[in-house]
């Protein structure tokens, strides 16, 4: 392993093995991002020569298999006070993967990992959720460990992020439901003692919210113990304006407007350890828990008017009381072992338990006769999963590698929904699913060409029970290939990727539990919902500061929202998910990322053209309007550790499935100052300055057309302060084996 004088890994260093007798070249290689290298060699002793730009060349003789860690010294040249400055490219693409070099850019001091992710070209951030343009919500990993929520991201300082990688066409090694991946690699520290980070944040939307965190790490020799805790108190407000027409038989016209103020309090905690038995074997464990409580505090107004054939049918003032309690527990154990010089084994075991209790009371008072009607709903859902995963990595030779492995999971979800008034039938449901999976990926490198071919097999046995009766019993058997091929033509890089994925319904989409919104509007699961299959092909080309990508997606059994009439209740509908025959879309994206001194702008422009048709009001309707993205992000690093950020995002109008979404935008600014040798960071942000991120969409399906306007009151001011000592790093090495199951919960 090659490291610098600060014990940081040196990547892309050239390693040559020379003959001891005459210093002739035997073979060679290049270090990876962890500073590691594996060079098959038949001689018992050789001279190891290591060279890298910015470091002194290192030479020494070693016996085969006894090299250990090699430290490179910085190469310093005095040029009589002449200062030469260069700017390293911080956005790059290799083998189809887009990488941000955080440590060698101004993003290093941007704040937290949550802020770094926003700077990935093509990344959208709306109402607390990340979305890859044209791909949906990504799965996020930190050092190979799946993140089940954003707590791990918010606890990770950007100073401890080495790089961020976006994979938009994951290979066979990733779970079949993963459509895009964000891999965060952190900076590794080897100092013994106590390290950590403490921080606090306060934000003002319509109401005040606050967040406090502490993260501690104790490292001593081969033992590493970590502890993290975060408290979050979020106040949020939201307004809905809905205009809906129901043309099933008579024409029902619903006009409603509502505004809610709520509070969510959560406690997140993480404790674990790593222990290096020796240089070849490491074990560890982790417990991750979360307790969250949600409560609706106020509803300034909530009214609805319903017309039947243009005659007023009802006019009501509504009052909603709602609360949720959620508990989450995850235990993970892992082993990482180097079995031989060329073979490594990773083992993970997981146990997950989650519980959600939801209570709702809706009071509807008529404006016509002042009669009140109260509806109580109570839902209780529990989820349990056990999972095992094993992965082998076999370096066959210097050009070829084979990764193969298997995983197993058994998950169950059960619960009930109760309506005291008997308006909606009570329900008890239970879903069970057992999964067996295996995969293999062969990677090769020859001259200017690099590639990989992968194959993943998954077998699923699922049983859905409602009211004690088996409603659906299904076996899924899927063989999912993937392919990647990349090359260079001079300074032009090209990459072709293909992947096949499957997206299975969440348990909420499958269960028969009913959510009551009002007397004309219910929401419910669909136990007959089938998985959707995604076939994705990408071609990417990069040159200098330019990166261009073409993408074609074909989705079989496409999952989308639909509406059905409620029997015996004219004008009342239930929204649920269903399958369409297929869905297609063709997209393009261009990223330009130049550097002008202290200013690093990034321009991203993208467009997707969908091809989708459904039945609406007895006729076939096309949902084919293209949608787009325009983003202009700017970071300016000033003297004395001042940082300034100014970003503009514009989501351009178009069809997202059955939704025709109007355009919306956001303009954000940030000022940051670092003190005490960059250990203390003070940040002030202003987000959605022009209050232009309000959502407005229209959905037409079956016999219903609904226009919805949503205001999340995103305009806000945020102030935060954090203090780092010894550059904290959570060094947990487990990857987790239940990522798919946790995501579906």
Write out the residue ranges for each language-model feature.
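N-terminal periplasmic accessory domains that precede
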Residues: 65-72, 113-116, 150-151, 166, ...
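Short, acidic, small-residue-rich periplasmic hinge/interaction motif at the N-terminus
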Residues: 16-18, 49-56, 65-106, 126-127, ...
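Outer-membrane beta-barrel signature, preferentially recognizing the C-terminal barrel domain
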Residues: 430-433, 471-474, 502-556, 574-587, ...
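Face-selective signature of the C-terminal outer-membrane beta-barrel domain
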Residues: 268-293, 318-467, 488, 492-493, ...
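Short, acidic Ser/Thr/Gly-rich low-complexity loop/linker segments typical of extracellular
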Residues: 21-36
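Outer membrane beta-barrel strand-and-loop segments of large Gram-negative receptors
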Residues: 385-389, 435-437, 530, 536, ...
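Short acidic/polar hinge/loop motifs at secondary-structure boundaries
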Residues: 119, 145-171
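Surface-exposed extracellular loop regions of Gram-negative outer-membrane beta-barrel proteins
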Residues: 185-200, 239, 243, 255, ...
